Amino acid sequence: MVSSRASRRKRASATDIYKTCKQSGTCPPDVVNKVEGTTLADRFLQWASLGIFLGGLGIGTGTGTGGRTGYIPLGGRPSTVVDVTPARPPVVIEPVGPTEPSIVQLVEESSVVSSGTPIPTFTGTSGFEITSSATTTPAVLDITPASGSVQISTTSYTNPAFADPSLIEVPQTGEVSGNIFVTTPTSGTHGYEEIPMQVFASHGTGTEPISSTPVPGVSRVAGPRLYSRAYHQVRVNNFDFVTRPSSFVTFDNPAFEPGDTSLTFEPADTAPDPDFLDIVRLHRPALTSRRGTVRFSRLGKKATMFTRRGTQIGAQVHYYHDISNITATEDIEMQPLLTSESTDGLYDIYADADIDNAMLHTTSHTGSTGPRSHLSFPSIPSTVSTKYSNTTIPFTTSWDIPVTTGPDIVLPTASPNLPFVPPTSIDTTVAIAIQGSNYYLLPLLYYFLKKRKRIPYFFTDGFVAV
């Protein structure tokens, strides 16, 4: 079985390959030599042509063309085409002599000038004839009115040059005082018109949208970023920058200068202030607060360079002047209205001024555990006119002194013998017996498991802290 061979694809011509690969420099050497004529055969012919003449023979490495005249077939001659030149009329060239004028007249001379159509002439007496006739019949017009109704029309015109005094309208009295209110009589019948009133805004909750598509939230206008890297910061210490900013850029007359608008200047070589050199525009001012000061700011644009197209190139500068400092809030110390004295170790006790049978005595008892004391309160004279008075007495928190209730609490039965409280240390738990109808235990003896609270000590009417 004969296997089929793949068909060989024809390569592009050397000229096509040379056009595409010459620019990139990837042409094969044989293609370059063939197109440029630098093959070995071409070089041999060049060397041989130095000694012999081979011109016109068409000998070369290229396609054979037979030279300039082509190949001549055997047994015949090549067909030739004879070009016949069309005949042209001869042009007579007239020589110009030295005495003849050199001005060429484009229009030939003519002695006859056409004057147009001649005007016709009329001869004789013929023409329009005018005849006159005379009649003796007078022209009589019939002025007898025709039968029927008679219509009379009258038309009057007013002459502005003359006006009858009876037709002049008397001018009304005008108000020359400062009162702008015109009063009208209230008596009688007055005409009026009822106009229905329309409600423009109904009462609602106040949250209804005022547009068809309300924008959620509040949109705020972003302030100028004056302290970014795009602006060069320049501080101006002169206060004239606030009132007369143009005096720093140009030498002009400050008779009129708007201070709240943008200012435009022409480029100048010099400026009163070197910091304002090449400034062509100062924007409108802005008041800001920066680090505890009220600051007056203006943005300026410089035109340092100009391109050939007229484009201005320059930096943007932030000029600012601190007007005043924002002082911090002063801390005013509050003064007390009443002077207070030190009451270390003193407590206030409300006592009844009407009780006279109470006595202050201290009794010492000696036992097996130690001595003990008993403290009672006598009747204290009142310093005010009310029933109860406030008297300050010294008081110490000793463990061996039991305290009874105040004299203002009347008990139904009172025991003459007070219970004995043995002195113990603070670290150990003791049992406390207090005679009274109402009392609070010492907060130090409470056992708090999780959270502790600060409980104040009270020693007032009916409340005793031990």
Curated annotation (Swiss-Prot):
Gene Ontology BP term (one): microtubule-dependent intracellular transport of viral material towards nucleus
Domain of life: Viruses
Motif Nuclear localization signal per UniProt: ranges: 1-12, 447-455
Pfam families: Late_protein_L2
Alphabetized GO MF terms: DNA binding; structural molecule activity
Family: Belongs to the papillomaviridae L2 protein family.
Physiological role: Minor protein of the capsid that localizes along the inner surface of the virion, within the central cavities beneath the L1 pentamers. Plays a role in capsid stabilization through interaction with the major capsid protein L1. Once the virion enters the host cell, L2 escorts the genomic DNA into the nucleus by promoting escape from the endosomal compartments and traffic through the host Golgi network.
Protein's recorded name: Minor capsid protein L2
Organism of this sequence: Human papillomavirus type 70
